[in-house]
């Protein structure tokens, strides 16, 4: 039975329509970020037209390819997304979200990532499934993201990992900036784990100085290690802090020891043995279960009985469902539940010795080596 043609759209229909029509508007987010429209609008500090925003933009950046018509449509759509306020007669005004985006540059780069690489992958999901007779789950470097490049005729990028593609397309520095602050965090890493009930202070203070070594695997620009050093300056020096990041655009990170380790290579074992802490923050959700087990097993093989592996990821629930989708489409990864973490640990020769799963934000999972 179909709904009457003249009946008003029910609330459920409005919800469906407003959600599924977001994608085209989200496609304009990279335009807003590229031309710094949020910063220009905030600088004006009062209701403004697209022409006003373009004038500020030219004052800041000189002559660019930003036209008034492109700025007007982009500002309008950003207003529709709630990123700024829409006023009558194509007039726009900064709001709290605008100010947040300007004050949190990493959030703008994150918005660009999910509406560039993420939106591209989502557009090719159904095509990838149909063309492979709905083969699922995806495997690393064989996701809708790579399939998009294959169908666009770029066979070289179609075989590359997302990070490699971003490097080749000049997008990796932007992504690295996103990872430094993401969409905002509560406090530092020590603050966050304390709030979840983890006794980091007791662990640090009860460990002999010669055994204090922290290894951050996939640690980006070293933010976590630097936060640890700031929390325990009397205990942690450069030689205690090891950053392992396989990323061509990271550069030199002061105050930590940088060490190359490409864990993707089958013959490449974890070079640091017996560290007190091995950390993986937002690393495993980029990996499939098989690849996650491989990485966990490599760490397990070098762990001492006193070693801990600390994992920080989003708690898998309704609040993280959208990032779960992004990990699937771009990386063949996923967010994980308590049961899924236990399964991964068991397959890798580890056991969970602490876990906390807040309803919002990052979960914390501590794993230790299973002793025979």
From Swiss-Prot:
Say which domain of life the source belongs to. Eukaryota
Q: A Pfam family this protein belongs to? A: Methyltransf_2
Q: In which pathway does it act?
A: Secondary metabolite biosynthesis
Mind listing the UniProt keywords for this protein, alphabetically?
Methyltransferase, S-adenosyl-L-methionine, Transferase
Chain residues that bind S-adenosyl-L-methionine:
186
What's a BP term from Gene Ontology annotated to this protein? methylation
Single GO molecular function: O-methyltransferase activity
Look up keyword Ligase and say if it applies: no
Question: Per the UniProt record, which EC number(s) apply here?
Answer: 2.1.1.-
InterPro entries attached to this UniProt entry? COMT-like, O_MeTrfase_dom, SAM-dependent_MTases_sf
Record: active site: 285
- Family per UniProt? Belongs to the class I-like SAM-binding methyltransferase superfamily. Cation-independent O-methyltransferase family.
Q: What is the role of this chain?
A: Cytochrome P450 monooxygenase; part of the gene cluster that mediates the biosynthesis of bifonsecin B, a dimeric gamma-naphthopyrone. The first step in the biosynthesis of bifonsecin B is the production of gamma-naphthopyrone precursor YWA1 by the non-reducing polyketide synthase albA, via condensation of one acetyl-CoA starter unit with 6 malonyl-CoA units.
List, alphabetically, the PANTHER family matched.
PUTATIVE (AFU_ORTHOLOGUE AFUA_4G14240)-RELATED, PUTATIVE (AFU_ORTHOLOGUE AFUA_4G14580)-RELATED
Listed name of the protein: O-methyltransferase bfoE
What is the species of this protein? Aspergillus brasiliensis (strain CBS 101740 / IMI 381727 / IBT 21946)
* Taxonomic lineage from the root: Eukaryota, Fungi, Dikarya, Ascomycota, Pezizomycotina
């Amino acid at each position: 039975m179909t709904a009457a043609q003249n009946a008003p759209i029910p609330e459920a229909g409005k919800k469906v329509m407003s959600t599924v029509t977001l994608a085209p508007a989200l496609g304009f987010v990279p335009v807003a970020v590229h031309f710094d429209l949020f910063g220009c609008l905030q600088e004006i500090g009062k209701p403004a037209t697209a022409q006003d925003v373009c004038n500020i933009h030219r004052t800041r950046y000189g002559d660019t390819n930003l036209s008034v018509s492109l700025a007007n449509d982009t500002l309008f759509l950003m207003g529709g997304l709630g990123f700024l306020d829409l006023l009558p007669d194509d007039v726009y005004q900064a709001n709290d979200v605008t100010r947040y985006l300007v004050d949190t540059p990493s959030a703008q780069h994150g918005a660009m990532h999910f509406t560039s690489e993420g939106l591209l992958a989502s557009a090719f999901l159904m095509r990838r499934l149909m063309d492979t007779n709905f083969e699922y789950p995806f495997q690393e470097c064989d996701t809708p993201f790579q399939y998009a490049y294959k169908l666009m005729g770029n066979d070289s990028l179609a075989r590359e990992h997302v990070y490699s593609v971003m490097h080749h397309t000049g997008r990796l520095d932007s992504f690295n900036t996103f990872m430094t602050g993401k969409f905002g965090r509560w406090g530092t890493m020590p603050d966050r784990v304390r709030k979840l009930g983890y006794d980091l202070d007791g662990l640090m203070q009860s460990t002999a100085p010669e055994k204090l070594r922290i290894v951050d695997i996939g640690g980006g620009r070293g933010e976590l290690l630097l936060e640890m050093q700031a929390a325990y300056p009397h205990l942690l020096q450069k030689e205690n802090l090891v950053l392992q990041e396989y990323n061509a655009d990271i550069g030199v990170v002061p105050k930590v020891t940088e060490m190359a380790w490409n864990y993707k290579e089958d013959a490449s074992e974890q070079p640091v043995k017996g560290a007190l802490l091995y950390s993986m923050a937002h690393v495993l959700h980029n990996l499939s279960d098989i690849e996650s087990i491989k990485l966990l097993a490599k760490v397990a093989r070098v762990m001492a009985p006193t070693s801990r592996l600390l994992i920080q990821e989003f708690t898998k629930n309704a609040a993280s469902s959208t990032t779960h989708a992004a990990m699937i489409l771009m990386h063949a990864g996923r967010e994980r539940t308590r049961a899924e973490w236990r399964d991964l640990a068991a397959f890798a020769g580890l056991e969970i010795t602490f876990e906390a799963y807040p309803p919002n934000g990052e979960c914390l999972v501590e794993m230790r080596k299973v002793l025979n």
